[in-house]
Every structure is written in structure tokens, then in C-alpha cells.
């Protein structure tokens, strides 16, 4: 889509001269890695069924996290240093509007961009009121969902880490403890809250957090489908700017023995999630067995209640053969759904543009 209008905050935030975006395509200013996600978001918005005046029911807005290019002449602000082109993270809110002109009604896309800032200001900042965020990964470790609330704390954009190995984010020295945590999750269905452990931010440094764990056990396969973690940040990383690129000079050199040990821990966690017989699975099995037994008992009692009435009908038919007869068919349909509704927290964060 071609940009038709911008607010003055575009200049103060990204440094572009006034009206420089007018007549150009918005996607030209989007980071190349975010363009597919951006295009998909726009396409899905246009595909929503419209009602009167071309508005979606309630005119709902969709959101996504996206990096937008800064003006090359801008010399201040955070971002990746020593690069010709730098980008800044934003939460984009999309709404579609109908505007009537001399050519008729035209649908315009209105984008409200809210800049993300790092949640930390000083190295290893102790955090007391961090906004919790949710991550969900499958039994094979693949990250399936991450909250937008995580962006100021971890620095990752959701599309950068989705379908990646969530276990790679854990500090190698904490994998031993986390293996015990996962064993408890599988056996008990969850963990109320863990001890503090470390997770890697986008800049390569680690922050400390505590997590409330839960899981979903498929009642049909009796296997763990996914694990949900509600994370509470308690201490920031040594580099407070989580949006910076990792410093290769700070990378810790590991011996081959340490690497092998780290890989073994991760394999053991995956095996735990896929092989250990779980208490929740047994509970689900018992619940399903009880439902079947209850259904069978109900059907038996129903048939017993209907039996005297059927006999009376038969006697009436014998006494008065001229009366037409009828049948009573009793049908009961029962269904047990293996699906469990889980609502991912949807919210936005950041400071609105001024």
C-alpha cells in the first residue's frame, strides 16, 4: 500500500523529513525479515468478512510486532551500531477505514505504531513489578507462541523465535535443574513456581526469571502436547539494551565435553516430555473410563424405565388391533472432545508515539 499521510511523530521518532514517506510503499520501510509477516497480516485483515459500510463487526484491530527502518541521517537513538541501515522495534495496530471520495468508497489501512523500549535501564537491574508473559512450546521443544509483552524484556520479535528450539534459550548451567522441573511438569501436570533460572535475551546476555508451568495432556493419545510457561522477570541482563546485536567477543568458549553435556541435557528433557508415563494422562484415562461407565449406567436405567411402558403399549395393541401402532426409538449421542481451550494473552506494550 502507498502511504497517503503520516503524523509529525514519524520525524521525531525515526528521523525522516516531513512527508518523505508520502507516495512510497510502507513495506519498503519494513525490515526484510518482517515483510512476509506484515503482508500476511494485511491479507488476513482484508479477508475478514465485511458488513455494512465495509466495516468488520465491531471494527476490530489486529496487531503485530515489526521493525521499521530509521532515517540514515539520524545519528541518535538505540539500534544496531556501525551499520548503514538500522531498524527500531514497534507494535503495529491495524484498522481498516472506509473513505468516500469523488471516485467512490476506498478502503484505507490506518497503522498506529508504538515504539518498544528495553525494559531495563541499568546492568543487572532488579525488577519488582515486571509484566509477566507467556511462552508455549511443543513436546519436541519447538516454540509455538510468545507474548508481545516479552519484547521489552527479551528483545526477540515473535516471528524471529517461533518454530525455534525453546530449550536453546536456557543457560547451559541451569539445564540440570530444568530437567528436574520438566520431569515434575510431566508427572504432575505443572509446577506452581520454579526457583530462579536464566534465559538468554536477544543481545546474548542472560536475565533471571521464575516461571509458573502448566501443560496439556491429550486425553486420546495420553501424551503431552505442549507446555505453557508464565514467566516473571526478577533481574535484567548485564547489558540493559536487549535490542542490541550479540557481541561475538563476549561469547563464552565451551569445551567439547561441555557442549556434549549440554546437548545431553536437552535430549533428556525432550525424551522426558515424550516418553515418561504421566500422572495427568492416568487421570484423563480414569476420567474417560468413568464417563463411559456413567453413560452405560444411564442407558441401562433409561431402558429399565422404558420397559414397563413398552409392555403396556403391547397389551393395548393386542386388545385393540384396529389402533395403529408406533415405535419409540431412544437415541443418545455422546461426544468427548480432546481439545482444551487456552486463551494466549493478547496485549500490547510500549510507549505511544508523541
From Swiss-Prot:
Highest taxon of source: Eukaryota
GO molecular function: transcription cis-regulatory region binding; transcription corepressor binding
Residues covered by the PAS domain: 1-55, 133-235
Post-translational modification: Phosphorylated with a circadian rhythmicity.
One GO CC term on file: nucleus
Region (Disordered), start-end ranges: 318-354
Signal peptide: none
Keyword Phosphoprotein: yes
Subcellular location: Nucleus
Gene3D superfamilies given in the database record: PAS domain (3.30.450.20), Single helix bin (1.20.5.770)
Polar residues composition-biased segments: 345-354
InterPro entries in the record: PAS, PAS-like_dom_sf, Period_circadian_regulator
GO biological process, one term: circadian regulation of gene expression
Annotated keywords: Biological rhythms, Nucleus, Phosphoprotein, Repeat
Function: Involved in the generation of biological rhythms. The biological cycle depends on the rhythmic formation and nuclear localization of the tim-per complex. Light induces the degradation of tim, which promotes elimination of per. Nuclear activity of the heterodimer coordinatively regulates per and tim transcription negative feedback loop. Behaves as a negative element in circadian transcriptional loop. Does not appear to bind DNA, suggesting indirect transcriptional inhibition.
Quaternary structure note: Forms a heterodimer with timeless (TIM); the complex then translocates into the nucleus.
PANTHER family documented for this protein: PERIOD CIRCADIAN PROTEIN
Protein name: Period circadian protein
Lineage start: Eukaryota, Metazoa, Ecdysozoa, Arthropoda, Hexapoda
Amino acid at each position: 500500500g502507498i502511504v497517503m499521510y503520516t503524523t509529525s511523530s514519524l520525524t521525531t521518532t525515526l528521523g525522516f523529513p516531513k512527508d518523505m514517506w508520502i507516495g512510497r510503499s510502507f513495506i519498503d520501510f519494513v525490515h526484510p525479515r518482517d515483510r512476509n509477516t506484515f503482508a500476511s497480516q494485511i491479507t488476513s485483515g482484508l479477508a475478514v468478512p465485511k458488513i455494512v459500510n465495509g466495516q468488520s463487526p465491531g471494527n476490530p484491530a489486529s496487531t503485530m510486532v515489526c521493525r521499521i527502518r530509521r532515517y540514515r541521517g539520524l545519528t541518535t537513538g538505540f539500534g544496531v551500531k556501525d551499520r548503514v541501515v538500522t531498524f527500531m522495534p514497534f507494535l503495529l495496530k491495524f484498522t481498516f477505514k472506509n473513505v468516500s471520495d469523488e471516485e467512490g468508497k476506498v478502503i484505507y489501512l490506518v497503522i498506529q505504531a508504538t515504539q518498544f523500549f528495553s525494559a531495563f535501564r541499568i546492568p543487572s537491574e532488579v525488577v519488582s513489578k515486571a509484566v509477566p508473559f507467556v511462552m508455549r512450546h511443543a513436546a519436541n521443544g519447538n516454540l509455538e507462541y510468545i507474548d508481545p509483552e516479552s519484547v521489552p524484556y527479551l528483545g526477540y520479535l515473535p516471528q524471529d523465535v517461533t518454530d525455534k528450539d525453546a530449550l536453546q534459550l536456557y543457560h547451559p548451567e541451569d539445564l540440570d535443574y530444568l530437567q528436574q522441573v520438566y520431569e515434575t511438569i510431566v508427572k504432575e501436570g505443572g509446577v506452581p513456581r520454579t526457583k530462579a533460572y536464566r534465559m538468554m535475551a536477544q543481545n546474548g546476555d542472560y536475565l533471571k526469571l521464575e516461571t509458573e508451568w502448566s501443560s496439556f495432556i491429550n486425553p486420546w493419545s495420553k501424551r503431552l502436547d505442549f507446555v505453557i510457561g508464565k514467566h516473571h522477570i526478577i533481574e535484567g541482563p548485564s547489558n540493559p539494551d536487549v535490542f542490541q546485536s550479540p557481541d561475538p567477543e563476549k561469547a563464552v568458549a565451551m569445551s567439547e565435553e561441555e557442549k556434549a553435556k549440554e546437548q545431553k541435557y536437552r535430549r533428556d528433557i525432550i525424551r522426558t516430555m515424550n516418553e515418561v508415563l504421566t500422572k495427568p494422562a492416568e487421570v484423563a484415562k480414569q476420567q474417560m473410563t468413568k464417563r463411559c461407565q456413567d453413560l452405560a449406567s444411564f442407558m441401562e436405567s433409561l431402558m429399565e424405565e422404558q420397559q414397563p411402558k413398552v409392555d403396556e403399549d403391547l397389551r393395548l395393541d393386542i386388545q385393540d388391533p384396529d389402533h395403529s401402532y408406533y415405535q419409540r426409538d431412544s437415541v443418545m449421542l455422546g461426544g468427548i472432545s480432546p481439545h482444551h481451550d487456552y486463551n494466549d494473552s493478547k496485549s500490547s506494550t510500549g510507549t505511544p508515539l508523541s
